[in-house]
Each structure stands twice: as structure tokens, then as C-alpha cells.
């Protein structure tokens, strides 16, 4: 992992040619595939519901977070997700993370491999999902995909040149409990994370609810119909660690969320978030763009077998 500000001359061109350009071309090619899907996605950025990716489908997503930093420099973090429906009960996902701290530098911060499993085949009033994630990242990570333990705003004051040298390997577990009632989705996520070095288990939570602006679909296909928009709210924060469990020295956020599902298969989402105590960033602005590709797995399989 390298910091862009540390690169000079030919090294910068090597990075662009060998790393950034291939990632951009791969994402552009995938996003250019036709998508034929009417699935509605919830607009959450932190919380998860009980829906998995359809088997054989691939979703490509770009997400960003702008955050304010008291006593330091504001930042813009970003990550790309590749989510694949392996089976009807298993969805797997790969992340590539980075961030830019203003008046500091740009850093690639790590990779993540996420897996979600659905133990119950049929829909229930409450649907459990088991979540397992492996993270290889450095201390400059600022994507705030979750808040755990005693994570606070002051942790982000360390300069990138120092923070990126501190590497960690973590395992993250979640129990997701989600259901739908009268068009509303309600979900609760309980988090436990462990740095594989000699560190205690850390805990966190996320709560969310959302609903389409209209439950009945329009008779004609349209982009601005009310049923294409989903609005909601999510709240998330840390719960301390094994030695000091609870709300002491933790940060918490409340964020309205809005998603726009387009008939073409694209989804746009946005969420302004607000810190609820002095340990939290005062303001977070998140936005994202995603595209689902139906039948990606079978299509790739046919390509390798030489069939049309």
C-alpha cells in the first residue's frame, strides 16, 4: 500500500499504469454490461438487511464519505465493492479501500473480504443473517463502514505518513436480524470485531428502517415514479470492548438515507450523517453509485467454455 504524495516522477506513472488504470478499466467494463433487473435495494451505508445477491448476479458499487475533523484536516474516503451471489444462501464480496486527507496525502488503505450466510431458507417475520469479514488494512483507514469499540474522531488526527505504516488483520462478525412489515424494512446488526494481534474483542451496533415512497408499481416504466425512491434512517456506533463494554468513550451517528433505483439497473444513494456526541465527527456526507449485472456468473462460465 502506497501514499500518492510519496510518489515522484516515473514512480507515479508506474502506479497509474499498473494499478489505477486497470482498476478503472475493469470497473468501466463491468458497469457497461447490460443490466435487466427490477430488484429494489435498501439505501443503507452501514446497516445490512436480510436480502442476499441473487445467485449468479454481480453488483459493482462505488461509495464515498466526506467527513469533517475538528483539530485536523477534513477527509474524503472511498471504496469499491464487488458483490457476487454465490448461492441462494451465500453472498461474497470484495472491497478495495482508500482515502484522501486534505492538505495531507492520498492513501490506499486496505482490502476486505466479506461473506454473508442465510441459515433459513424461507422468509420469516425476523430473518437472521450470519456475517463474516476479513480485513487487511492500515491505521489510515477512514471509510467508517462501521463503528466499533472505542473508535472516536480523534483517532483520525494521525498523519497519513505515520498511520499507513501500522498494519492490522481483523476478523469481524455480525448477527443481522431483519424483516419487512407493511412495506417497512427494519434491521438490527450486532457487531464483534477482533484484531488478530493481541487485542480484545470490540463491539458495535447498527439500527435502520426504510420504506419505498410508494408500494404499488406504476403501470408504465419510469425513472421518477415514487416507488423507485426508498427513504429511511440509520443509527450506528460503538459499544466498547471486552474490558470496558458500554457507551463510555464511544462515538455514535444518526443519518437519514435516500436511495433511487433506476429501471436501467443503476442505483444512486445519499446520506448526510450527524455525530451524536463529542467523540463523533460532527458531519459525514455519504454517496454511492451501483449497478447490478444479471447472470454474470453463467455469462463468464460460457466465455471460458467457449460457448456463445
Feature locations, PLM:
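Bacterial N-terminal signal peptides
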Residues: 22-32
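Sec/Tat signal peptide C-region and signal peptidase I cleavage site
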Residues: 33-39
Amino acid at each position: 500500500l502506497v501514499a500518492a504524495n510519496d510518489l515522484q516522477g516515473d514512480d507515479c506513472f508506474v502506479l497509474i499504469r499498473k494499478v489505477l488504470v486497470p482498476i478503472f478499466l475493469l470497473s468501466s467494463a463491468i458497469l457497461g454490461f447490460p443490466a435487466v433487473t427490477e430488484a429494489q435495494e435498501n439505501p443503507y451505508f452501514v446497516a445490512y438487511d436480510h436480502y442476499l445477491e441473487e445467485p449468479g448476479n454481480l453488483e459493482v458499487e462505488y461509495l464515498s464519505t466526506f467527513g469533517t475533523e475538528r483539530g485536523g484536516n477534513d477527509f474524503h474516503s472511498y471504496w469499491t465493492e464487488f458483490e457476487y451471489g454465490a448461492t441462494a444462501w451465500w453472498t461474497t464480496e470484495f472491497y478495495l479501500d482508500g482515502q484522501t486527507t486534505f492538505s495531507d496525502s492520498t492513501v490506499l488503505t486496505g482490502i476486505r473480504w466479506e461473506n454473508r450466510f442465510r441459515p433459513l431458507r424461507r422468509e420469516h417475520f425476523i430473518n437472521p443473517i450470519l456475517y463474516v469479514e476479513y480485513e487487511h488494512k492500515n491505521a489510515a483507514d477512514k471509510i467508517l463502514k462501521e463503528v466499533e469499540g472505542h473508535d472516536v474522531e480523534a483517532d483520525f488526527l494521525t498523519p497519513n505518513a505515520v498511520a499507513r505504516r501500522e498494519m492490522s488483520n481483523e476478523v469481524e462478525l455480525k448477527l443481522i436480524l431483519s424483516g419487512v412489515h407493511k412495506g417497512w424494512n427494519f434491521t438490527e446488526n450486532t457487531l464483534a470485531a477482533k484484531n488478530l494481534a493481541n487485542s480484545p474483542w470490540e463491539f458495535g451496533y447498527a439500527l435502520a428502517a426504510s420504506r419505498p415512497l410508494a408500494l404499488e408499481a406504476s403501470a408504465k416504466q419510469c425513472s421518477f415514479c415514487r416507488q423507485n425512491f426508498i427513504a429511511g434512517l440509520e443509527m450506528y456506533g460503538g459499544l466498547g470492548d471486552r474490558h470496558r463494554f458500554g457507551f463510555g468513550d464511544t462515538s455514535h451517528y444518526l443519518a437519514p438515507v435516500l436511495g433511487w433505483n433506476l429501471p436501467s439497473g443503476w442505483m444512486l444513494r445519499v446520506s448526510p450523517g450527524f455525530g451524536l456526541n463529542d467523540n463523533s465527527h460532527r458531519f459525514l456526507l455519504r454517496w454511492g453509485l451501483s449497478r447490478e449485472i444479471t447472470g454474470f456468473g453463467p455469462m463468464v462460465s460460457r466465455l471460458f467454455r467457449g460457448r456463445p
